[in-house]
Protein backbone atom coordinates (compact mmCIF):
# COMPACT_ATOMS: atom_id res chain seq x y z
CA UNK A 1 0.00 0.00 0.00
CA UNK A 2 1.19 3.51 -0.80
CA UNK A 3 -0.13 6.94 0.28
CA UNK A 4 0.84 10.40 -0.92
CA UNK A 5 -0.11 13.72 0.68
CA UNK A 6 0.53 17.01 -1.13
CA UNK A 7 2.63 15.17 -3.72
CA UNK A 8 4.87 13.75 -0.98
CA UNK A 9 4.97 10.01 -0.44
CA UNK A 10 4.06 9.44 3.21
CA UNK A 11 3.78 5.66 3.12
CA UNK A 12 5.49 3.40 0.61
CA UNK A 13 5.11 -0.32 0.03
CA UNK A 14 3.41 -0.98 3.37
CA UNK A 15 2.57 -4.63 3.91
CA UNK A 16 1.41 -5.31 7.45
CA UNK A 17 -0.84 -8.07 8.70
CA UNK A 18 -2.84 -7.58 11.89
CA UNK A 19 -4.72 -10.63 13.12
CA UNK A 20 -7.20 -10.93 15.96
CA UNK A 21 -5.46 -11.28 19.33
CA UNK A 22 -2.32 -9.56 17.94
CA UNK A 23 -0.83 -6.73 19.99
CA UNK A 24 1.24 -4.30 17.92
CA UNK A 25 3.22 -1.16 18.56
CA UNK A 26 3.23 1.04 15.46
CA UNK A 27 6.23 3.28 15.96
CA UNK A 28 8.51 5.66 14.12
CA UNK A 29 9.68 9.26 14.23
CA UNK A 30 7.32 12.21 14.12
CA UNK A 31 5.96 12.68 10.60
CA UNK A 32 6.65 9.10 9.52
CA UNK A 33 2.99 8.39 8.73
CA UNK A 34 1.81 6.52 11.84
CA UNK A 35 -1.44 8.44 12.18
CA UNK A 36 -2.01 8.33 8.41
CA UNK A 37 -1.71 4.55 8.51
CA UNK A 38 -4.35 4.42 11.25
CA UNK A 39 -6.61 6.67 9.17
CA UNK A 40 -6.16 4.26 6.23
CA UNK A 41 -7.02 1.27 8.43
CA UNK A 42 -10.15 3.07 9.63
CA UNK A 43 -11.20 3.94 6.09
CA UNK A 44 -10.93 7.68 6.77
CA UNK A 45 -8.36 7.92 3.97
CA UNK A 46 -7.94 5.90 0.78
CA UNK A 47 -4.57 4.50 -0.32
CA UNK A 48 -3.13 5.72 -3.62
CA UNK A 49 -2.20 2.14 -4.45
CA UNK A 50 -2.90 -1.18 -2.80
CA UNK A 51 -5.67 -2.01 -0.37
CA UNK A 52 -6.41 -2.33 3.32
CA UNK A 53 -7.68 -5.64 4.67
CA UNK A 54 -7.99 -6.05 8.40
CA UNK A 55 -8.32 -9.26 10.38
CA UNK A 56 -8.21 -11.35 7.23
CA UNK A 57 -10.90 -11.02 4.58
CA UNK A 58 -12.87 -8.25 6.27
CA UNK A 59 -16.48 -8.31 5.10
CA UNK A 60 -17.62 -4.87 6.20
CA UNK A 61 -17.41 -1.46 4.56
CA UNK A 62 -15.66 -0.01 7.59
CA UNK A 63 -13.57 -1.28 10.46
CA UNK A 64 -15.38 -2.16 13.67
CA UNK A 65 -12.86 -0.53 16.02
CA UNK A 66 -12.53 1.11 19.38
CA UNK A 67 -10.40 4.16 18.65
CA UNK A 68 -8.35 6.68 20.60
CA UNK A 69 -7.33 9.53 18.30
CA UNK A 70 -4.47 11.90 19.12
CA UNK A 71 -7.01 14.56 20.01
CA UNK A 72 -9.69 13.82 22.59
CA UNK A 73 -12.99 13.49 20.75
CA UNK A 74 -15.62 13.93 23.41
CA UNK A 75 -19.07 15.49 23.64
CA UNK A 76 -17.88 18.46 25.70
CA UNK A 77 -21.12 19.31 27.53
CA UNK A 78 -21.81 15.71 28.51
CA UNK A 79 -20.33 14.09 31.60
CA UNK A 80 -17.68 11.39 31.56
CA UNK A 81 -20.43 8.94 32.48
CA UNK A 82 -22.61 10.02 29.53
CA UNK A 83 -19.67 10.01 27.09
CA UNK A 84 -18.84 6.41 27.99
CA UNK A 85 -22.41 5.06 28.24
CA UNK A 86 -23.54 6.55 24.90
CA UNK A 87 -21.26 4.35 22.77
CA UNK A 88 -22.76 1.05 23.87
CA UNK A 89 -26.54 0.89 24.16
CA UNK A 90 -26.30 -2.38 26.11
CA UNK A 91 -24.09 -0.72 28.72
CA UNK A 92 -25.88 0.79 31.70
CA UNK A 93 -24.70 4.00 33.31
CA UNK A 94 -23.99 1.92 36.40
CA UNK A 95 -21.50 -0.26 34.49
CA UNK A 96 -20.01 2.82 32.78
CA UNK A 97 -19.58 4.33 36.24
CA UNK A 98 -17.84 1.20 37.51
CA UNK A 99 -15.37 1.34 34.61
CA UNK A 100 -14.70 5.06 35.04
CA UNK A 101 -14.30 4.66 38.82
CA UNK A 102 -11.25 2.50 38.19
CA UNK A 103 -9.45 5.71 37.18
CA UNK A 104 -11.50 8.75 38.21
CA UNK A 105 -12.89 9.90 41.57
CA UNK A 106 -16.66 9.45 41.86
CA UNK A 107 -17.31 13.21 41.96
CA UNK A 108 -15.61 13.68 38.55
CA UNK A 109 -17.92 11.23 36.73
CA UNK A 110 -20.88 13.61 36.46
CA UNK A 111 -19.21 16.93 35.59
CA UNK A 112 -19.06 17.98 31.92
CA UNK A 113 -15.87 16.64 30.32
CA UNK A 114 -14.93 20.20 29.34
CA UNK A 115 -14.19 20.70 33.07
CA UNK A 116 -11.88 17.69 33.35
CA UNK A 117 -8.10 18.05 33.21
CA UNK A 118 -6.27 16.69 30.12
CA UNK A 119 -5.29 13.37 31.72
CA UNK A 120 -8.82 12.78 33.02
CA UNK A 121 -10.19 13.48 29.54
CA UNK A 122 -7.68 11.03 28.06
CA UNK A 123 -8.84 8.37 30.51
CA UNK A 124 -12.48 8.90 29.48
CA UNK A 125 -11.55 8.52 25.81
CA UNK A 126 -9.54 5.37 26.53
CA UNK A 127 -12.27 3.73 28.63
CA UNK A 128 -14.87 4.57 25.98
CA UNK A 129 -12.74 2.96 23.25
CA UNK A 130 -12.33 -0.19 25.33
CA UNK A 131 -16.04 -0.71 26.01
CA UNK A 132 -17.25 -0.18 22.43
CA UNK A 133 -18.18 -3.56 20.93
CA UNK A 134 -15.38 -3.96 18.39
CA UNK A 135 -12.94 -6.33 16.72
CA UNK A 136 -9.82 -4.25 17.30
CA UNK A 137 -8.51 -1.34 19.38
CA UNK A 138 -6.56 1.41 17.57
CA UNK A 139 -4.90 3.72 20.09
CA UNK A 140 -2.97 6.77 18.85
CA UNK A 141 -0.74 8.21 21.60
CA UNK A 142 -3.13 6.94 24.30
CA UNK A 143 -0.87 7.74 27.26
CA UNK A 144 -0.27 11.42 26.57
CA UNK A 145 0.30 13.29 29.84
CA UNK A 146 0.30 10.17 32.04
CA UNK A 147 3.09 9.26 34.43
CA UNK A 148 4.58 5.75 34.20
CA UNK A 149 2.49 4.34 37.08
CA UNK A 150 -0.79 5.47 35.53
CA UNK A 151 0.39 4.39 32.07
CA UNK A 152 1.11 0.89 33.36
CA UNK A 153 -2.31 0.71 35.04
CA UNK A 154 -3.98 1.85 31.79
CA UNK A 155 -2.03 -0.73 29.76
CA UNK A 156 -3.21 -3.50 32.11
CA UNK A 157 -6.80 -2.23 31.77
CA UNK A 158 -6.60 -2.13 27.96
CA UNK A 159 -5.16 -5.65 27.78
CA UNK A 160 -7.85 -6.94 30.13
CA UNK A 161 -10.70 -5.28 28.24
CA UNK A 162 -9.36 -6.25 24.82
CA UNK A 163 -9.80 -9.95 25.51
CA UNK A 164 -9.38 -11.59 22.09
CA UNK A 165 -9.38 -8.30 20.15
CA UNK A 166 -6.34 -7.11 18.28
CA UNK A 167 -4.64 -4.01 19.69
CA UNK A 168 -2.54 -1.43 17.86
CA UNK A 169 -0.73 1.13 20.01
CA UNK A 170 0.76 4.09 18.13
CA UNK A 171 3.68 5.79 19.88
CA UNK A 172 7.14 7.11 19.19
CA UNK A 173 8.63 5.01 22.00
CA UNK A 174 7.93 1.58 23.44
CA UNK A 175 7.77 2.57 27.13
CA UNK A 176 5.58 0.01 28.87
CA UNK A 177 4.79 -1.73 25.57
CA UNK A 178 7.77 -4.06 25.30
CA UNK A 179 5.35 -7.02 25.10
CA UNK A 180 3.99 -5.82 21.73
CA UNK A 181 5.21 -6.82 18.31
CA UNK A 182 6.72 -3.78 16.57
CA UNK A 183 5.96 -2.30 13.18
CA UNK A 184 8.39 0.54 12.50
CA UNK A 185 7.78 3.24 9.88
Provide a role label for each language-model segment.
Residues 42:
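Helix-to-loop junction immediately C-terminal to a conserved catalytic motif
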Residues 93-108:
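Conserved ABC ATPase "signature" region
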Amino acid sequence: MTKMVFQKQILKDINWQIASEDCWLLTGPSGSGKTMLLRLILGLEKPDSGSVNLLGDYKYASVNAGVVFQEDRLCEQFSALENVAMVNERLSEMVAGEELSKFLPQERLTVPVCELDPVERRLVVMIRACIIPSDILLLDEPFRGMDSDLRDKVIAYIRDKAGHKGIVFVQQDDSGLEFCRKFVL
